Regions:
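Short, flexible loop/turn elements at secondary-structure junctions
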Residues: 10-12, 37, 60-62
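Short, surface-exposed beta-edge/turn micro-motifs
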Residues: 2-3, 28-30, 50-51
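Conserved NAD+-utilizing ADP-ribose enzyme module
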Residues: 47-49, 60-224
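ADP-ribose/NAD+-binding catalytic cleft of ART/PARP-like enzymes
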Residues: 1-26, 224
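Extended catalytic/binding region for NAD+/ADP-ribose chemistry, centered on the ART fold
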Residues: 22-47
Length: 224
């Protein structure tokens, strides 16, 4: 099965190179794509510079694909991977213990997969995750927050095998004048909606990370 993917960049990339990605991206080193052209356009530009949306097809037949949004996994699996690759601003002793607990209890060999599909931790999503780690929001609020802004899933090639299956099709120059405002608007909208979400009154049954640790809760205790 072939999937059409887009990658936003400052340049045209005809041959993605295995091993050249930044190790501190969400899921580690890899080639980060989306199925949404406009999202790729937003990723490609900054305030002062235009960019390129590169179009590819990926033959997924036989590839080992990790879909973090499938029922087999949970939001803490996504967060656990982020903890391995991104640097969080932890403001308390509790936050450090939270990281240790998630690393010890929600680990799995995600690097054995060829492709990872899941949320993209842009600036707003990343701040939501930090709030959860600092015990500021519940796990239910985190799940709702990650649907704000309509960022969709990113598709990340992480194995050499996956890189051998991607084929360049075309590229499109995209303007900062068009895509940077929509990029800013999407982030602002997500943050505004998050503030509205935070203003809602506390509900009985909400589970915070401190409770998860105190009760030594695991995946099966939280997601049934």
């Amino acid at each position: 099965m072939n999937e059409i993917l887009y990658h936003g960049s400052a340049r045209k990339i005809e041959k993605p190179k295995f091993g050249s990605g930044k190790p501190n991206n969400d899921y580690g080193s890899g080639f980060y794509c989306t199925k949404d052209f406009d999202l790729a356009g937003e990723w490609a530009v900054n305030l002062d510079n235009d960019g390129y949306v590169n179009e590819y097809t990926l033959d997924t037949d036989g590839l080992h694909i990790l879909n973090l949004n499938s029922s087999e996994y949970c939001i803490l699996d996504w967060l656990r991977i982020l903890l391995e690759n991104r640097r969080f601003d932890i403001q308390s002793d509790f936050g450090s213990e939270a990281i240790r607990y998630l690393r010890d209890n929600f680990s799995f060999d995600y690097r054995s997969f060829d492709v990872i599909k899941g949320y993209r931790a842009d600036d707003s999503y990343f701040s939501f995750a930090q709030d959860f780690l600092n015990n500021t929001i519940s796990i239910r609020t985190l799940e709702k927050a990650l649907l704000l802004g309509n960022l969709g899933d990113q598709v990340v090639l992480i194995s050499k095998r996956a890189f051998e299956r991607i084929i360049f099709k075309d590229y499109y120059r995209v303007s900062s004048a068009r895509y940077y405002p929509s990029k800013e608007m999407r982030d602002t909208k997500a943050r505004d909606e998050y503030r509205d979400l935070r203003r809602k009154p506390w509900s009985k049954g909400e589970i915070y990370l401190m409770q998860i640790i105190d009760r030594e809760m695991k995946r099966d205790d939280l997601f049934v």
